[in-house]
């Protein structure tokens, strides 16, 4: 090889190219570590009705590792999405030392259980309920049932509309039986949903009879049990049931 000029030239060229690569890599590493590229600004925009940008920024900045070039954008996105009210975050670099973050927040539909909220998309999330702008419906159900409960809430709102009542509480029991508390104060036991017609048929029976029910007992119906196959039972304020002793006095 040492007597072969062509091979020596090739080897020298290869070593020279390798040296240039090493120097270029070292130069790049030196450059990207300069203080000028340390992250100095996090710009937050997007849907932030319930999101306080300074609070989010303060909660995330200590979890960001690296500078403009080395920060992991996926890890940064996850950090933002772990903040209260944040449903989705997109993060991008802004030359030379900033991140631009666009946030999408959860749209609350109501409360879920004791300490969670549920979104209009049926997603559970945790946030300060004191930040809610209005009294929202209450929901509860078995694990994994949030989307089903939210869908049924919308159905109940439509089915009970003819009696001018809206759902304020919707509960799905561990046995998958439905209970609804309406805005007129009435609690409705609907039972289990055996097929797609079970719930609308039961509610329709009550709706059809509602004029007669309110004419007889007034509008203050406290409870309705719709689980019967061909009818329903109600309890109205002031309704009194006779005991055997009462019957004997008549």
UniProtKB/Swiss-Prot annotation:
<feature type="transmembrane region" description="Helical">
    <location>
        <begin position="12"/>
        <end position="32"/>
    </location>
</feature>
<feature type="domain" description="POTRA">
    <location>
        <begin position="37"/>
        <end position="106"/>
    </location>
</feature>
<dbReference type="InterPro" id="IPR034746">
    <property type="entry name" value="POTRA"/>
</dbReference>
<dbReference type="GO" id="GO:0032153">
    <property type="term" value="C:cell division site"/>
</dbReference>
<dbReference type="InterPro" id="IPR045335">
    <property type="entry name" value="FtsQ_C_sf"/>
</dbReference>
<keyword id="KW-0132">Cell division</keyword>
<keyword id="KW-0472">Membrane</keyword>
<dbReference type="GO" id="GO:0005886">
    <property type="term" value="C:plasma membrane"/>
</dbReference>
<dbReference type="InterPro" id="IPR005548">
    <property type="entry name" value="Cell_div_FtsQ/DivIB_C"/>
</dbReference>
<keyword id="KW-0812">Transmembrane</keyword>
<keyword id="KW-0997">Cell inner membrane</keyword>
<feature type="topological domain" description="Periplasmic">
    <location>
        <begin position="33"/>
        <end position="250"/>
    </location>
</feature>
<feature type="topological domain" description="Cytoplasmic">
    <location>
        <begin position="1"/>
        <end position="11"/>
    </location>
</feature>
<comment type="function">
    <text>Essential cell division protein. May link together the upstream cell division proteins, which are predominantly cytoplasmic, with the downstream cell division proteins, which are predominantly periplasmic. May control correct divisome assembly.</text>
</comment>
<dbReference type="GO" id="GO:0043093">
    <property type="term" value="P:FtsZ-dependent cytokinesis"/>
</dbReference>
<keyword id="KW-1133">Transmembrane helix</keyword>
<dbReference type="GO" id="GO:0090529">
    <property type="term" value="P:cell septum assembly"/>
</dbReference>
<dbReference type="InterPro" id="IPR026579">
    <property type="entry name" value="FtsQ"/>
</dbReference>
<dbReference type="Pfam" id="PF08478">
    <property type="entry name" value="POTRA_1"/>
</dbReference>
<comment type="similarity">
    <text>Belongs to the FtsQ/DivIB family. FtsQ subfamily.</text>
</comment>
<comment type="subunit">
    <text>Part of a complex composed of FtsB, FtsL and FtsQ.</text>
</comment>
<keyword id="KW-1003">Cell membrane</keyword>
<dbReference type="InterPro" id="IPR013685">
    <property type="entry name" value="POTRA_FtsQ_type"/>
</dbReference>
<dbReference type="Pfam" id="PF03799">
    <property type="entry name" value="FtsQ_DivIB_C"/>
</dbReference>
<protein>
    <recommendedName>
        <fullName>Cell division protein FtsQ</fullName>
    </recommendedName>
</protein>
<keyword id="KW-0131">Cell cycle</keyword>
